[in-house]
């Protein structure tokens, strides 16, 4: 839907008067390498999450055992704006005190993560894992600075 409308999932659902299904957090689980990767990255970097997620994102990260590695959590339901809207990225940058050129957006979605981050001048890493493996880069504006196959591959670049 992004490539046609350039609107976030929440905005499209609202316009279509679609009630999004309740998020079943008990089915959430981390990729095998997630906790170790976050732990290692948090030693040298401040880590923030920008997510199109319902209320309670921070608590769910706590339940998964990784919140302690994350400095900032920006969830669309709490901010009233969702990716790919650049405002959610600007909120994260402002709260972190980070300039776009000093930030790296790591994401699995070209439309919601890579494109808006590049437009703001952030560096980008596309993880082609899970949902990310379903995407194909179609335009130069969608090309990430770095492409990796899984989260732990990021450690080779940062």
Residue positions per predicted region:
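Metal-dependent phosphoesterase signature
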Residues: 1-32
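Asp-based, Mg2+/Mn2+-dependent phosphohydrolase catalytic module
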Residues: 10-14, 18, 35, 39, ...
């Amino acid at each position: 839907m992004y490539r046609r409308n350039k609107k976030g999932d929440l905005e499209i659902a609202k316009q279509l008067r679609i009630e999004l299904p309740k998020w079943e957090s008990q089915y959430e689980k981390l990729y095998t390498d997630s906790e170790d990767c976050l732990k290692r990255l948090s030693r040298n970097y401040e880590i923030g999450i920008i997510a199109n997620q319902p209320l309670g994102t921070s608590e769910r990260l706590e339940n998964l055992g990784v919140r302690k590695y994350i400095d900032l959590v920006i969830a669309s339901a709490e901010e009233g704006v969702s990716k790919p809207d650049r405002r959610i990225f600007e909120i994260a940058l402002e709260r972190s005190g980070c300039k776009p050129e000093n930030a790296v957006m790591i994401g699995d979605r070209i439309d919601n993560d890579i494109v808006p981050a590049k437009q703001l001048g952030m560096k980008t890493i596309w993880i082609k894992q899970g949902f990310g493996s379903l995407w194909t880069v179609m335009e130069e504006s969608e090309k990430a600075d770095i492409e990796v196959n899984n989260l732990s591959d990021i450690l080779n670049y940062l």
